[in-house]
Amino acid sequence: MSVMFDPDTAIYPFPPKPTPLSIDEKAYYREKIKRLLKERNAVMVAHYYTDPEIQQLAEETGGCISDSLEMARFGAKHPASTLLVAGVRFMGETAKILSPEKTILMPTLQAECSLDLGCPVEEFNAFCDAHPDRTVVVYANTSAAVKARADWVVTSSIAVELIDHLDSLGEKIIWAPDKHLGCYVQKQTGADILCWQGACIVHDEFKTQALTRLQEEYPDAAILVHPESPQAIVEMADAVGSTSQLIAAAKTLPHQRLIVATDRGIFYKMQQAVPDKELLEAPTAGEGATCRSCAHCPWMAMNGLQAIAEALELEGSNHEVYVDERLLERALVPLNRMLDFAATLRG
């Protein structure tokens, strides 16, 4: 496939790691955040991949821990006038699209996503223009501008069902931006899919040989894999699914030991779900290999206690999410299509 932008050759500079806080500093910021949430009539929504102390704070303050879409849905239904989104930038944008009347704050607007960065809207528009006969389906991990170009937005939890539905209608698909998830969906459905070639820097680093060695060390363990992982890793899995689906699989599988191939942030909620089971990280480096993300998104790690307190206290252009009104209206169309489709699956 020829594209103007090649995500495979792009090197994304990682943000600096947050300065560690002392125990006293953590206690200070936790109490400050709790007070500011009440004063601002705000609720905190956190992604599964944020650090455990952030997820714990969201729980303690009546917030939400979930995937990106459920974060936005929770925020839209919640009576709070302000949403504090602990995640990456596209999650804040999605929350704003679904709750345009609310103030959306983020600890930092510099928290990126390699899938979002790997799908620049100008190049993606040109790619779509070159294939006008195809239905455009984009993953939730994209900018508002890319969503606005799409016919459908989709999450990993319903990707197979949606593409199977579109395939049954005889539609040919453009899929963006995750090539591994696109490959997985194509194999599951047999649909005619033309994939953009983006990848998640975390899931792309899982190594087959190292995972095989870990499996040999723990032959009684089940392997849980997020479909953003390379095909060879997916083929080793006992369960494949989105973050929420992997947590459900952890409860359902009889195995007492689980090897988990996704961001280690998920361990907080997964361990709550299966307190008696042992969770092991799938390896992201092996012999002769090194890892950059090492199973944790560096941009998710930017959502620290100090940054959250600052967002609630200062607001302003460094923390508030804005989406152009015309762009918002266009992006809402494929998002609502997805929500309606998801409702039919649940119903």
From Swiss-Prot:
Iron in keyword set: yes
Places the protein is found: Cytoplasm
GO terms under cellular component: cytosol
Entry EC number(s): 2.5.1.72
Binding site for iminosuccinate: H47, S68, Y139, A140, N141, S156, H226, P227, E228, T243
Known role: Catalyzes the condensation of iminoaspartate with dihydroxyacetone phosphate to form quinolinate.
Family in the record: Belongs to the quinolinate synthase family. Type 1 subfamily.
Record protein name field: Quinolinate synthase
